[in-house]
Amino acid sequence: MSLPSNVYESIHRAWMGDTLEGLKDFIRIPAKSRAFNPNWESDGILKRTLEDSAEWGRRLLPCAEFEIIEKPGIPPALFIRIPTAGGHKGKPAFFYGHLDKQPEPEGWSEGLGPWTPVVRDGRLYGRGGVDDGYNYYLTLTAVKALEEAGAAHPEIFCLFETDEESGSRDLARYIQELAPRI
């Protein structure tokens, strides 16, 4: 399937605008995975990360459904359902990613830090911007670009967990519980 050239233009425009700003906001949150933050449940940082991400996603894709799934003692996850568009009549697609981070290392170059997003020479620096935080923003931006171009896409389900950096101990449980809805 070839895509209209305006899809790529739309992605580039979004990436340099709202998507980049959303990713910068994500970098600012020290959303360390539970293995690195024993207070993850009481401090609410992982949940806040999902709330902020869902808010950004709702602005981008108002037709999508965003649900934060919480269970005591288990890091929260964000489940998303994006309705089919353009009359697509195929099987649904499933995207996975994570929005938790490893601890901040030492040794940042001058002017850079883990929780301070900086664009330098066309590159974005900050903790979580490449492993795997960008995935959330890229996935939703790509779907939006398809819709703006009038391209068809299947129903899309996404699961973004906050425990990948600690081994994804509860990922199988989340997928099993969500399977009837996918």
Q: Residue ranges of each PLM-predicted region?
A:
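N-terminal helical capping/dimerization or prosegment-like subdomains
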Residues: S2-P105
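Predominant activation on well-ordered alpha-helical scaffold segments within soluble catalytic domains
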Residues: K24, A54, Y137-L140, K144, ...
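Gly/Ser/Thr-rich beta-alpha loop segments that engage phosphate groups in nucleotides
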Residues: K32, G128-V130, R169
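Short, small-residue-enriched loops and turns at beta-alpha junctions
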Residues: S42-D43, G133, D163-S166
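Short alpha-helical patches at coil-to-helix transitions and adjacent helical residues
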Residues: L50, D132-Y136, S168
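Secondary-structure boundary motif
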Residues: R59, A145-A149, Q176-P180
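Active-site metal-coordination/substrate-binding segment of hydrolases
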Residues: K89-F160
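Histidine/acidic-residue-rich, glycine-tolerant segments that coordinate divalent metal ions
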Residues: H153-I182
